[in-house]
């Protein structure tokens, strides 16, 4: 209300300013100094506060007084010099406790690995995976013999095979199965042994080979046929 009465009594007139374009063209606005945006205040000027300030004097703090003050620190921190610890210091037993704890942890891990994870079993190696060149006769072996292997016969087995060869140089299927069971060999092993023994016997007795003998007989028949044809031509 006081402000409005002042405006009425003073007959205040609203000022009129030219447009901004005229200001920019006629350079009415002078260049302002950097200090224009931060106007300095007089040192003598003091703005009266709204509330009266109480007479409070600030006390400066000194580092020595702060360190030596009796203010207790916040939290669970306690002064070691003022309050002695109820438990005595045990420097020698601490490492022993840590070592025992680590050992128990290692034992627990080992038990977990043994109980939870099964141990790795060795890989199964089948007979066909082995590269065997010379094999000894195994009496408990009943399966087929691996290929490209040379069997080492025992003295007793060779003696029994020689007896069979002395009576008959060719074995029947039934006799071959019986001898294979008695000598703990396979039929293939006995068959190969008899083949080799027959070749050796022919070589010792200097008998001609059956293949060469048949070829020589064929050549003789051819020669006789040629001679007969020549004689017939001459007679004509």
Swiss-Prot record:
CDD domains: homeodomain
Region (Disordered): 69-91, 204-236
Biased segments, Polar residues type: 79-91, 211-223
This protein's encoding gene: hoxd4a
Superkingdom of source: Eukaryota
Name the UniProt record assigns to this protein: Homeobox protein Hox-D4a
Gene3D superfamilies in the cross-refs: Homeodomain-like (1.10.10.60)
Organism from which the protein derives: Danio rerio (Zebrafish)
Matching PROSITE patterns: ANTENNAPEDIA, HOMEOBOX_2
